[in-house]
Regions:
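Glycine-rich phosphate/pyrophosphate-binding loop and the adjoining helix
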Residues: 138-195
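Residue-level recognition of the N-termini of beta-strands and the immediately preceding loop/turn
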Residues: 34-35, 123-125, 163-166
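Active-site donor-binding loop signature of nucleotide-sugar glycosyltransferases
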Residues: 39, 84, 131, 170-172
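A structural motif corresponding to the C-terminal end of an alpha-helix
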Residues: 30, 75, 81, 122, ...
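Short, structured loop/turn "capping" segments at alpha-beta junctions
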Residues: 103-108, 161-165
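Short, basic/glycine-rich phosphate-binding loops at helix/coil junctions
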Residues: 43-51, 127-133, 165-167
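Short, glycine-/small-residue-rich phosphate/pyrophosphate-handling segment
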Residues: 109-155
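N-terminal beta1-alpha1-beta2 submodule of the flavodoxin-like/Rossmannoid cofactor-binding fold
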Residues: 1-105, 181-195
Length: 195
């Protein structure tokens, strides 16, 4: 399977980088074709440019993100690895969606600018792996898993409704002992071995 791994954490080393390395190793060991994009290390610019926004309804200006678009269209599986900050993804990952999952690539607008028509028909699976400093009950019971909800409902259901979503959250990571890190790595390996 063609797997695109997208990592979004500014620090290296970090728990996200450790989890990303485990994911890449597991997928490579399983003989999947892999491409890895580390948004911070690659210098990805997250802000939608004025030219891109001006071209939104008339053939999106893709020059600056051509490689990222090529990777998106190549992928059958996407693995996202990122921290959750303020119960949302890092700005750089949000910017990746804003600039890469665009009209004519990830979806088409209806002629009347009504319902969106999905275009990412090759995408079969998305795996999101995120770390949070908060306890699980804040995410689940108070905020009702906002990152998962946006990814599934707003992004995947409109651009790739056939794609399944697996969402792994690791909580209270700022005080996670080594055995907790090992357990997270084992959980990721187990899940990715069965793609």
């Amino acid at each position: 399977m063609r797997c695109l791994i997208v990592t979004a954490h500014p620090l290296n080393p970090s728990l996200c980088q450790t989890l990303s390395n485990a994911a890449i190793d597991t997928l490579m060991d399983a003989k999947h074709q892999c491409r890895h994009v580390d948004l911070y290390r690659s210098g990805f610019f997250p802000a939608l440019t004025p030219a891109e926004r001006a071209s939104y309804y008339s053939g999106f200006e893709t020059t600056e993100v051509a490689k990222e678009i090529e990777d998106l269209l190549w992928a059958e599986t996407i693995v996202l690895i990122f921290p959750t900050w303020w119960f949302g993804p890092p700005a750089i990952l949000k910017g990746w969606f804003d600039r890469v999952w665009v009209p004519g690539i990830a979806y088409d607008h209806a002629a009347d600018l009504g319902a969106i028509q999905p275009r990412l028909r090759q995408l079969r699976k998305v795996v999101a792996i995120t770390t949070l400093g908060s306890p699980w009950w804040v995410d689940w019971l108070i905020l009702r898993r906002p990152v998962r909800r946006v990814l599934k409902t707003a992004i995947l259901n409109t651009c790739a409704p056939q794609a399944s979503l697996t969402f792994l959250s690791f909580y209270k990571v700022e005080s996670l002992p080594r055995q907790g890190v090992d357990a997270a790595i084992n959980r990721i390996r187990s899940m990715l071995q069965h793609l």
